[in-house]
């Protein structure tokens, strides 16, 4: 059974391996563990104030992640959205469930805008975000912050 729940520290190493495998091996993105020190400290980096980090598990297996970083002034950044290749697509609807979890939380916490940055080569992700109401925007329309990775070249906005 698939469950979406807030991140628990027992998943730290599995989460780091999961994300790096997708970034490096599946999409050949030039991102290393050292580029993402926040992954080793999810509770302090993502689970404070109005920010949060959720994981999707099938039994004990980590199959998806999504995070929200509070940027202040009602703005948030969608971060670390990853879904295991075997759980992608409409059959499972896992990406949509993860996004719905984040959006529901964002509305409860009175966010007005969500932003995200993504890599050019992640075409399926672009289609997913656009299908779910995100609009492509210029880099200068996105609030600055450490959530923007060097590989991010496409930026999106969603008004809540």
Locations of regions flagged by a protein language model:
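Extreme N-terminal starter segment of soluble prokaryotic enzymes
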Residues: 1-3
């Amino acid at each position: 059974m698939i469950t979406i729940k807030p991140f628990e520290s027992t998943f730290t190493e599995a989460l780091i391996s999961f994300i790096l495998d997708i970034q490096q091996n599946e999409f050949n993105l030039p991102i290393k563990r050292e580029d993402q020190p926040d992954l080793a400290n999810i509770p302090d980096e993502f689970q404070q104030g109005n920010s949060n980090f959720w994981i999707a598990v099938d039994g004990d297996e980590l199959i998806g992640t999504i995070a929200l970083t509070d940027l202040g002034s009602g703005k948030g950044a969608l971060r670390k959205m990853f879904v295991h290749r075997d759980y992608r697509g409409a059959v499972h609807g896992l990406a949509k469930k993860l996004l719905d979890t984040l959006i529901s939380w964002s509305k409860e916490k009175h966010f007005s805008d969500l932003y995200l940055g993504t890599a050019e080569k992640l075409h399926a992700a672009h289609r997913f975000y656009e299908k779910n109401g995100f609009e492509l925007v210029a880099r200068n329309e996105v609030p600055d912050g450490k959530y923007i990775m060097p590989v991010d070249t496409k930026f999106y906005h969603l008004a809540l």
